[in-house]
Swiss-Prot record:
The gene is ATPD. Belongs to the ATPase delta chain family. This is ATP synthase subunit delta, chloroplastic. It comes from Arabidopsis thaliana. PANTHER family: ATP SYNTHASE DELTA CHAIN. The modification N-acetylserine is found at S48. The keyword DNA-binding does not apply.
Length: 234
C-alpha cells in the first residue's frame, strides 16, 4: 500500500517572481454563495463534482485577484495531506458535531499549517455550507485549474524510497521535454509494492505512464514464462 506521505518538487520557467499580496483577501461568501445537496446516487455524484469544480474555480479567482496563486496551491497541498487522514474526514462528516466545534478544528488546522486568511475563510465556508465532505475533490479540481492557468504539467512519481532532489529534477526535465509544458510539478509517493525502481504518471488525468519498477519487470518475466513446462527439482 502506498504511503500517504507526499512531497513536492517543482520545475518552473525562469520568470520574474510575482509580488505576493496577502493582505487583500476577498470574502468567498460573496464570491461563491451556493449550497448543493448531495444525493446518494449517480446524479448526486455529478452534482458533487460540479460543486467541487465551482468551489475550486472560486478559490482560484480569489488567488488570482490577490496575486497569491503560488501560495494558494501550497495551501492546497497542505490540505491534501491533512484531509488524507480518514479520522479528519470522519470528524467533519459527523452530523452530531456542531459547526462551532468544526470551526475550532479549522482554526487549529489553519494555525498549524500556516494557511492564508482567504484559505481559512474558504474552509469555514465549506463547513457552514456542509460541503467540507468534498474538500478532497475540491483539492483535485483546484490543481487542474492551477495547472491550466500556469501551463503546468503534474507528474506523480512513485518509488520505494525517497528520491533525491537531483533525481527529481531529471524526471521533471524529462516530463517537460515530453509534454512541452512551461512548468512541471512533481508529486512523490512512497509505494513499497514496487519492490524497487519508480513509476512516473503524467498527462491528462495521469493517462501516460513510464514504469521503471522491478514489479513491472517481474510481471513481464512472469507473463513470458510457460509455467506448465517448468519442472521443480526434487
Amino acid at each position: 500500500m502506498a504511503s500517504l506521505q507526499q512531497t513536492l518538487f517543482s520545475l518552473q520557467s525562469k520568470l520574474p517572481p510575482s509580488s505576493f499580496q496577502i493582505a487583500r483577501s476577498l470574502p468567498l461568501r460573496k464570491t461563491f454563495p451556493i449550497r448543493i445537496n448531495n444525493g446518494g446516487n449517480a446524479a448526486g455524484a455529478r452534482m458533487s463534482a460540479t460543486a467541487a469544480s465551482s468551489y475550486a474555480m472560486a478559490l482560484a479567482d480569489v488567488a488570482k485577484r490577490n496575486d497569491t496563486m503560488e501560495l494558494t496551491v501550497t495551501d492546497i497541498e497542505k490540505l491534501e495531506q491533512v484531509f488524507s487522514d480518514p479520522q479528519v474526514l470522519n470528524f467533519f462528516a459527523n452530523p452530531t458535531i456542531t459547526v462551532e466545534k468544526k470551526r475550532q478544528v479549522i482554526d487549529d488546522i489553519v494555525k498549524s499549517s500556516s494557511l492564508q486568511s482567504h484559505t481559512s475563510n474558504f474552509l469555514n465556508v465549506l463547513v457552514d455550507a456542509n460541503r467540507i465532505n468534498i474538500v478532497t475533490e475540491i483539492v483535485k479540481e483546484f490543481e487542474l485549474v492551477y495547472n491550466k492557468l500556469t501551463d503546468t504539467q503534474l507528474a506523480e512519481v512513485r518509488s520505494v524510497v525517497k528520491l533525491e532532489a537531483p533525481q527529481l529534477a531529471q524526471i521533471a526535465k524529462q516530463v517537460q521535454k515530453l509534454t512541452g509544458a512551461k512548468n512541471v510539478r512533481v508529486k512523490t509517493v512512497i509505494d513499497a509494492s514496487l519492490v524497487a525502481g519508480f513509476t512516473i504518471r503524467y498527462g491528462e488525468s495521469g493517462s501516460k505512464l513510464i514504469d521503471m519498477s522491478v514489479k513491472k519487470q517481474l510481471e513481464d518475466i512472469a507473463s513470458q514464462l510457460e509455467l506448465g513446462e517448468i519442472q521443480l527439482a526434487t
